[in-house]
Structures are given as C-alpha cells and as structure tokens.
C-alpha cells in the first residue's frame, strides 16, 4: 500500500486487470488530489511491487487481502473507493458487505456486473497474451509500454524505467 497526502477523507485506488503498477499508473491522478485527500494505492498480489502468490483469486479473498493491507498500513475508513475496471466488482461487493467502511465509490472506467454478463472472453487469446508477456514477446511491440502514466509526464525517468521493467 502506497500512501501520501493528509486530508480528512481517504481515497483508496484499486486497479483493474492489466495494470502493471497501480502506484505508477495512478500517479498522474492522485498527485493532483493528495493536497486535499489522503491517498492509498493498493497493489494487489501479482501487481507492481507486490508479491506473486499461488492462491485462489476469488472476490472474497481479494477483498479480505485489500482490507488487511489497509489495516496493516494503519489506514482507517470509512473510505472513498476509486476502482478501475474489474475492481469495480470488488468495490461494489465491499460496499454491500461492509457498508460502514465505504463512504462513496468513484468509478474510474469501472466495470459493473452486467458488463461481465455480456462480455465474451476468449480464453485462448487471453492465454496467448499471458504467454507472450512471460516469454518477453511484448517487448517487441512498439509503444505497448508507453501508457498514459508515461505520457502524462508525472513519472520521473527512474519511475519510467521501473514501469517498463514491471510491464515486461
């Protein structure tokens, strides 16, 4: 969990799939908000600077891990959740299961359950992308690692290099 800022309200950023480093990906947004809010960016297992684990990744497990990470970091609710993409499901579940911990949800291109009901995921294409990344093939695709985080100009040169290393 990365934190900055000293405001009365705590914004908790939750990443979606394909976010290689939430701390760096969300920096261009939270750096604009940290003068007025306390910021907490949760890097779930397998993302960015967190550990990779071989455990079940169901919504109950992920929510439990997120809540525990915030607790261990000494960050108390209620929270304003800022979920991106598939973390929208976690945020909605959190608000339903622990309403006293969630003050509000501000979706960042947030997915909702109906989206997943209608979405048809191609498992072979998904697996191909995973294998390509694991083998380093994605390094050869021009501009793939040049995300908005890099283009926004809020990352230092060192952070850009870290981002690229984590991305690949």
Regions found by a protein language model. Name each.
Residues 104-168:
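Flexible "cap/lid" subdomain of the alpha/beta-hydrolase fold that forms the substrate-access gate
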Residues 6-8, 35, 75-77, 99-100:
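Active-site acidic short loop of glycosyltransferases
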Residues 77-120:
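Conserved hydrolase catalytic core segment
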Residues 3-49:
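Conserved HGGG/HGGXW glycine-rich cap/lid loop of the alpha/beta-hydrolase fold
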Residues 41-82, 98:
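Active-site loop/oxyanion-hole signature of alpha/beta-hydrolase fold enzymes
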Residues 25, 29, 62-66, 87:
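Stable alpha-helical elements in mature extracytoplasmic
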């Amino acid at each position: 969990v990365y934190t900055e800022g000293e405001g009365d309200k705590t914004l908790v950023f939750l990443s979606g799939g394909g976010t290689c480093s939430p701390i760096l990906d969300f920096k261009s947004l939270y750096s604009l908000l940290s003068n007025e809010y306390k910021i907490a960016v949760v890097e779930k297992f397998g993302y960015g600077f967190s550990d990779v684990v071989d455990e079940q990744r169901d919504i109950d497990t992920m929510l439990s891990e997120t809540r525990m990470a915030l607790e261990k970091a000494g960050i108390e609710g209620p929270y304003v959740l800022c979920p991106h993409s598939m973390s929208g499901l976690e945020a909605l579940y959190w608000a339903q299961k622990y309403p006293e911990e969630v003050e509000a949800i501000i979706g960042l291109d947030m997915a909702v359950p109906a989206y997943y009901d209608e979405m048809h995921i191609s498992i072979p294409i998904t697996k191909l992308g995973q294998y390509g990344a694991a083998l380093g093939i994605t390094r050869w695709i021009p501009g793939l690692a040049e995300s908005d985080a890099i283009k926004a100009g809020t990352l230092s040169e060192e952070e850009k290099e870290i981002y690229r290393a984590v991305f690949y």
